[in-house]
Amino acid sequence: MPKIRKAVIPAAGLGTRLLPATKAIPKEMLPLVNKPTIQYIVEEAVASGIKEILVIVSSKKEAIIDHFDYDFILENALLQKHKDQEHQEIKDIANLAHIYFVRQKHQHGLGDAILHAKSFVGNEDFAVLLGDDVVFGEQPALAQCIQAYEQTDCQVIGVQEVPHDQVNKYGIVTPEANWQKQALVKILGMVEKPAVNEAKSNLAILSRYILKPSIFTALKQVPFGVGGELQLTDGLNYCLQQGEPFFAKHFGGTRFDVGTKNGFIKANLYTALKTDAITKDEVLAILKEFA
């Protein structure tokens, strides 16, 4: 079985949930402490064995491209000021992986963004990571999905349980019977943002996928769906209906939806504590002062 070498990161969204901060700044460049969120996603991919990454961008996203490029003026300035650690950190960003970019000119949904990766992917199975979900843990979430792919030789979707009253915010999988507490379960169906009383489970599709090139054919066959957009979930369902097996991998780790204000704040606090940018006592003191 060939290794998963390539990953696609869609980053063309408008980030409307974080306006006005995202009016001129890509939401993917908003920082968790001192590192933009998309860098955490790229680092997860690299730590999972990915060698080549395609980032799908849109207009006003040049900052993402600049971030993963060399900056010789900045590097020289840091050297002259003997800031060796900062200099190395900046160089390391540009050397993380072979990173390419393509522009999605019109915002027609996640499925449309994935279609822009067809020539990059070729005939290889590949990974997809969405930038809204940052996951921290001992083992990268994507690496867990890749292991499940290697175990099953099937397409894999990363999932976690969400509260039952929030299933209408996610793509939800229909698992086979007796799925509770199983780390890997066969998928019978998928639906994008179902009504709370219609969801077959509370296993939410959460931004990590291992897919086969057949998804490109599927996305050409399905109509625009929820929100008037081309939904990746609909394309996955099409593949499922054609007899392609899928598995849901219940990945471990602490997940934050950094595309929301609440999740972004929580992720920053978590990152600050984990990197010793702030102590627990300092956080409690701040809460005592302002709460």
UniProtKB/Swiss-Prot annotation:
Keyword Magnesium: no
Catalysis: reaction(s): alpha-D-glucose 1-phosphate + UTP + H(+) = UDP-alpha-D-glucose + diphosphate
GO-annotated biological processes: biosynthetic process; UDP-alpha-D-glucose metabolic process
Domain of life from the UniProt record: Bacteria
UniProt keyword RNA-binding, yes or no: no
Listed Pfam families: NTP_transferase
UniProt keywords, alphabetically: Nucleotidyltransferase, Transferase
Enzyme class: transferase
A Gene Ontology molecular function term of the record: UTP:glucose-1-phosphate uridylyltransferase activity
InterPro entries: GalU_uridylyltTrfase_bac/arc, NTP_transferase_dom, Nucleotide-diphossugar_trans
EC number: 2.7.7.9
Function summary: May play a role in stationary phase survival.
PANTHER family hit by this protein: UTP--GLUCOSE-1-PHOSPHATE URIDYLYLTRANSFERASE
UniProt record similarity statement: Belongs to the UDPGP type 2 family.
Name of the protein this chain belongs to: UTP--glucose-1-phosphate uridylyltransferase
Species the sequence originates in: Mycoplasma pneumoniae (strain ATCC 29342 / M129 / Subtype 1)
Phylogenetic placement of the source organism: Bacteria, Bacillati, Mycoplasmatota, Mycoplasmoidales, Mycoplasmoidaceae
Name of the gene encoding the protein in the UniProt record: galU
